[in-house]
Curated annotation (Swiss-Prot):
It catalyses: beta-D-fructose 2,6-bisphosphate + H2O = beta-D-fructose 6-phosphate + phosphate; beta-D-fructose 6-phosphate + ATP = beta-D-fructose 2,6-bisphosphate + ADP + H(+). The modification Phosphoserine is found at residue 31. Gene3D superfamilies: P-loop containing nucleotide triphosphate hydrolases, Phosphoglycerate mutase-like. This is 6-phosphofructo-2-kinase/fructose-2,6-bisphosphatase. InterPro entries: 6Pfruct_kin, 6Phosfructo_kin, His_Pase_superF_clade-1, His_PPase_superfam, P-loop_NTPase, PG/BPGM_mutase_AS. Synthesis and degradation of fructose 2,6-bisphosphate. Phosphorylation results in inhibition of the kinase activity. It comes from Aquarana catesbeiana. Residues 1-249 are annotated as: 6-phosphofructo-2-kinase. Residues 250-470 are annotated as: Fructose-2,6-bisphosphatase. The lineage of its organism: Eukaryota, Metazoa, Chordata, Craniata, Vertebrata. Homodimer. Its EC number is 2.7.1.105, 3.1.3.46.
Amino acid sequence: MADRLRELTQTRLQKIWIPHQCDRLQQRRGSSIPQFTNSPTMIVMVGLPARGKTYISKKLTRYLNWIGTPTKVFNVGQYRRDATQSYNNYQFFRADNQEAMKIRKQCALHALKDVHTYLSREEGHVAVFDATNTTRERRSVILQFAKERGYKVFFIESICDDPDIIAENITQVKLSSPDYTGCDREKVLEDFLKRIDCYQMNYEPLHDDLDSSLSYIKIFNVGSRYLVNRVQDHIQSRAVYYLMNIHVTPRSIYLSRHGESELNLLGRIGGDSGLSVRGKQYAHELGNFIKSQQIPDLKVWTSHMKRTIQTAEALHVPYEQWKALNEIDAGVCEEMTYEEIQDHFPEEFALRDQDKYRYRYPKGESYEDIVQRLEPVIMELERQENVLVICHQAVMRCLLAYFLDKTAEELPYLKCPLHTVLKLTPVAYGCKVESIYLNIEAVNTHREKPLNVEVSRDPEEALDTVPEHF
């Protein structure tokens, strides 16, 4: 019985919705398509080119994956590039170019087929269909496709009539597009504006009355205004909540662990100890570094724990404390060394190595738990401009995984060394990372996953990757 309970608490949860093996859901004659509460969702982008649809698609996908909702982007433009191999000019997108129109339609259908495979056979929960989808006819095809398979549909329409924003988007993103390899800036701008004109001729935005039964959000001019209609469930609610918090203002986020602590020196996890001598030196150097950066309107955040607060105090600037930034709660293993955990709880030590992301310390937390409590922090980071977050190893890994789009399996093993600042600068479709070591020595607290993760392993094998400590 105990083994069974162990299995139930340590096994990864699967989604409730289970697709039928056939292509379409079975339905009794005269009945409607069943709509399960947890049925898969198609998020469908709508809008003219250079309106930030791909930016929104990738960013939203990264967020949903981070919170544990399996999500994938299906970019129809990439299907088109794969099918045509070469791009000549805007004339490919003319409405009277019948041959090109046929290719574009086939690419969209191919992408929809892959959406079905992902949602029905690959345990996906959300598929983001990234294309212009500017006509009612195209959107009707997508709606019918989703209806036949029992998928929910949520539209995201990005509307922008500010020529400066459009030109900036073309310059930042389209210049590096495979469509324009080797082209100069002026030719790219000219051709892409003509491509937009081709779509503009037949553009039919979502209509307040005609589309009143649909679920959607309209985003005007990169978030200056929003219109939300008929949100159906928590996935759509979270998508709306997220989209209303993000912005594109240039900024940097600085992540740093606290200075080396007294318990770090002893190789003990958790606790609430103060800084070591070297930790205090780092706090001083961190203050000098931040001052040298001359960062406008910098906000500084810490956890409620002594070692992050002592680190922030050395900066001589105002700071805010977040309980959500506290280190992972190791429960019964608090303030123990890895050697002591292996000695007292060898089974728990092995179970954590088997699935470090989902393993929860007895009476403590898992990395998965930390991600859930960090969601408000991520939302506020998305709203802010320049921020320095002084936190802890597990927390920093979770934040870093969000910005770098890392999987749950990669997250617990991201390297976040002491006395090092990570400067994260959002770029077009990702995040640029700079690692700045402030030249103050510290112990190594990073433990790699050992080769043998079985409960029956020898203690030497279990402790093989434990870093040296005093």
